[in-house]
């Protein structure tokens, strides 16, 4: 079947430019105004790094940043482990009794409203506190557990899609040569799905760092995450420190994303070369 001819129209370019402008112009304005010396975020008064200094001297903001980064890193790591296990069970173990129910329970958080998830987890923690005395109070631990709950679903979907694309002949050949299933997974399967694991980890980290609704339900008075602090601040007006913080986050996310993309692309190319070399041999 011949490919359909590409219809060149100026309207397509206009729509594309408008779409990118709508997406990235606010970010550009945010970065520019983070260097504004004025206290009023909408009034330009000259270039300055004043608000970056104020940001690092704000103990409440730095505490919230540290808490959010810690929770996000720990939640993403646990979600990557649990999501990998869940994906292997869904894809490699095939049909078993209760497989449909298992897959539904793993992926249900994807379509569950955050309000429902947060409220249900709050009721669970309260009930456990009355029944067994744990958790004694809500804070970093309960936020971490809540984030692991919904992040695992996203990681499982990412990794399961990668597992379905793999050529199982290499795994079967290794088992024919006497390798145990556990050794095959760690030596062959895991390196091949590592780009998906890294992608799932980054996705879980971003979702955890960005979460406001669920964390608001399961946190206590002594645990304030960065989205909660920013949300409470902007309700009384945008603080220029928030512009500086958002600019730093954009920069870090961009650098980390580029490094992850580069490493995954290089790993994937090396994997393809190794497979081709093995088939020639």
Question: Could you describe each region identified by the protein language model?
Answer:
Residues 1-29, 102:
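N-terminal signal-anchor/first transmembrane alpha helix
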Residues 105-143, 154, 195-199:
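Generic hydrophobic transmembrane alpha-helix motif, especially the helices
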Residues 14-15, 20-27, 155-160, 166-167, ...:
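Transmembrane alpha-helices
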Residues 3-8, 39, 52-61, 209-262, ...:
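Interhelical loop and adjacent transmembrane-helix boundary motif
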Residues 4, 25-59, 124, 219-221, ...:
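Short membrane-interfacial helix/loop motifs at transmembrane-helix boundaries
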Residues 2-14, 88-90, 94-98, 160-175, ...:
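C-terminal transmembrane helix and the adjacent membrane-cytosol boundary/short C-terminal tail
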Residues 25-28, 32, 81-85, 119, ...:
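Membrane-embedded alpha-helices of multi-pass transport/permease systems
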Residues 35, 59-90:
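Transmembrane alpha-helix signature in integral membrane proteins
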């Amino acid at each position: 079947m011949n490919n359909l001819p590409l219809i060149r129209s100026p309207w397509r370019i206009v729509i594309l430019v408008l779409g990118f402008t709508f997406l990235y112009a606010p970010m550009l304005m945010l970065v520019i105004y983070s260097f504004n010396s004025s206290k009023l975020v909408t009034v330009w008064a000259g270039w300055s790094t004043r608000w970056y200094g104020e940001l690092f001297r704000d103990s409440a903001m730095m505490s919230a940043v540290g808490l959010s980064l810690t929770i996000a890193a720990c939640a993403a790591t646990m979600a990557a482990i649990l999501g990998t296990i869940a994906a292997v069970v869904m894809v490699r173990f095939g049909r078993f009794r209760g497989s449909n129910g298992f897959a539904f329970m793993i992926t249900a958080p994807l379509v569950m409203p955050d309000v429902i998830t947060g409220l249900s987890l709050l009721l669970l923690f309260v009930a456990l506190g009355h029944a067994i005395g744990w958790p004694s109070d809500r804070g970093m631990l309960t936020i971490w557990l809540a984030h692991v709950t919904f992040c695992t679903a996203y990681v499982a979907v990412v990794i399961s899609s990668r597992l379905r694309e793999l050529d199982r002949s290499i795994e079967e050949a290794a088992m024919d040569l006497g390798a145990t299933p556990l050794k095959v997974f760690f030596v062959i399967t895991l390196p091949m799905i590592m780009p998906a694991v890294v992608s799932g980890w980054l996705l879980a980290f971003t979702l955890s760092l960005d979460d406001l609704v669920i964390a608001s339900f399961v946190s206590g008075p002594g645990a304030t995450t960065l989205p909660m602090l920013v949300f409470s601040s902007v309700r009384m007006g945008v603080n220029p420190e928030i512009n500086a913080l958002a600019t730093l986050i954009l920069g870090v996310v961009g650098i980390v994303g580029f490094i992850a993309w580069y490493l995954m692309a290089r790993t994937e190319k090396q994997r393809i070369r190794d497979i081709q070399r093995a088939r020639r041999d």
